[in-house]
Regions:
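A conserved beta-strand-loop-helix scaffold within acyl/acetyltransferase catalytic domains
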Residues: 56-60, 163-184, 188-208
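Acyl-donor-binding surface of acyltransferase catalytic domains
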Residues: 68-133, 263-269
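Conserved hydrophobic beta-strand within the GNAT/NAT acetyltransferase core sheet
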Residues: 92-93, 203, 236-241
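Conserved active-site alpha-helix within GNAT-family acetyltransferase domains
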Residues: 98-115, 219, 242-260
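Cytosolic beta-strand hydrophobic patch enriched in CBS
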Residues: 44-46, 177-183, 237-238
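Conserved acetyl-CoA-binding loop-helix of GNAT-fold acetyltransferases
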Residues: 71-84, 208, 214-227, 248, ...
Length: 271
C-alpha cells in the first residue's frame, strides 16, 4: 500500500474516484482527523480493480474505507487487497439506512467479514427548556491524559473509534468536554464529549466510572451537555442496539431511533 503523507493527496484521490463513478462508499473524509493520520504515518491507500481503498493503521487492527463502482466489485477487489497485504485484522464500518447498508453487509459477509456490533442513531428535537446541572465542570488540559486513559480502558477500540489525545485536547479547547470529579486527587467520576454546531448537538462519548454508577453522575453530565446545546435544533448520538440500559435512559429524555445504522464488521486474514 502507498503511504498518504498530505491531505491534498487524499482530496485528489477522492475527486478522481468520484469522477470515475466509484460511488459505493463508506468513506466520508474528515480533514482534521486525516491530517493527523497522514502526519503520523498511519494512513494508506491502494487501488484494486474498480475500488479505491483507504486504510488507517492502528496497533492491533486496521480500519478500511472504500470507494467502489459496485457492490460486486467491492467484494472482488477486497479479496485482492487482503491477499496482497498479508496477515492482519481489518475493521469496516457500514453506515446508512437498511436499504443502502444491507447490500454492502451481504457483500462483506460473503468474503469473510463477520459482524461485531450494530449501532443505531437516536435523535430528538431540542427541548425549549434545558435544566442546569450542579457539580459538572469544563475539563482542563490537565485532564486530557486521564480521559484518554479512561477511554482506552473502558471502550472497545474496534467498535467505538477511540479518539486521540490530540482530539481530546481539541474538545477541551472548544469547551465541548465536561467532567465530574471524584474525591481523590486527579480522579474523574465521569465525562461527556460532544460536537456542537448552530443546527445540532452530537454526543460523541459518555462515560461514568463503574464505581459511581447509579449515583446520578451520568444524568448530570447529560443535562449539562443538553444545556450547552439548548440553541440547536436537533440532538443526536449513536447507541449500541444491545445496550438496553442506555436506550431506556435516552428514551426517558425523548430520544427515538432513526433509520441510520452503523454495522461494524471484522475480518481476520491469517496466512
Amino acid at each position: 500500500m502507498n503511504s498518504l503523507r498530505i491531505w491534498a493527496t487524499v482530496q485528489r484521490l477522492v475527486v478522481v474516484s468520484r469522477n470515475e463513478g466509484l460511488v459505493v462508499t463508506n468513506f466520508f473524509p474528515d480533514e482534521e482527523r486525516m491530517v493527523v493520520w497522514c502526519r503520523d504515518y498511519a494512513f494508506y491507500e491502494e487501488r484494486c480493480g474498480e475500488t479505491q481503498f483507504f486504510v488507517r493503521r492502528q496497533p492491533t487492527f486496521s480500519n478500511v474505507y472504500f470507494m467502489s463502482r459496485s457492490v460486486d466489485a467491492l467484494g472482488k477487489d477486497w479479496k485482492t487487497l487482503a491477499t496482497k497485504n498479508g496477515n492482519g485484522r481489518w475493521i469496516v464500518d457500514l453506515i446508512g439506512p437498511d436499504r443502502v447498508r444491507q447490500p454492502l453487509e451481504d457483500a462483506m459477509s460473503s468474503v469473510g467479514f463477520s459482524r461485531l456490533t450494530t449501532l443505531q442513531r437516536m435523535g430528538r428535537k431540542t427541548p425549549e427548556d434545558a435544566e442546569q446541572s450542579l457539580g459538572v465542570e469544563h475539563a482542563t488540559l490537565d485532564d486530557a491524559e486521564k480521559i484518554k486513559e479512561l477511554l482506552d480502558a473502558h471502550f472497545i477500540a474496534e467498535e467505538e473509534q477511540i479518539p486521540s489525545l490530540e482530539e481530546i485536547r481539541k474538545w477541551i479547547g472548544i469547551q465541548s468536554l465536561f467532567v465530574m470529579r471524584g474525591g481523590a486527587v486527579n480522579s474523574i467520576d465521569g465525562f461527556v464529549i460532544f460536537d456542537l454546531s448552530p443546527a445540532a448537538l452530537y454526543l460523541r462519548y459518555w462515560f461514568v466510572h463503574p464505581s459511581v454508577r447509579g449515583k446520578g453522575v451520568g444524568g448530570r453530565l447529560l443535562k449539562a451537555m443538553f444545556a450547552a446545546g439548548r440553541t440547536t435544533k436537533r440532538q443526536y448520538f449513536w447507541v449500541k442496539t444491545d445496550n438496553e440500559n442506555a436506550i431506556k435512559r435516552y428514551r426517558h429524555y425523548g430520544f427515538e431511533f432513526e433509520p441510520m445504522k452503523d454495522v461494524v464488521m471484522a475480518y481476520a486474514n491469517v496466512l
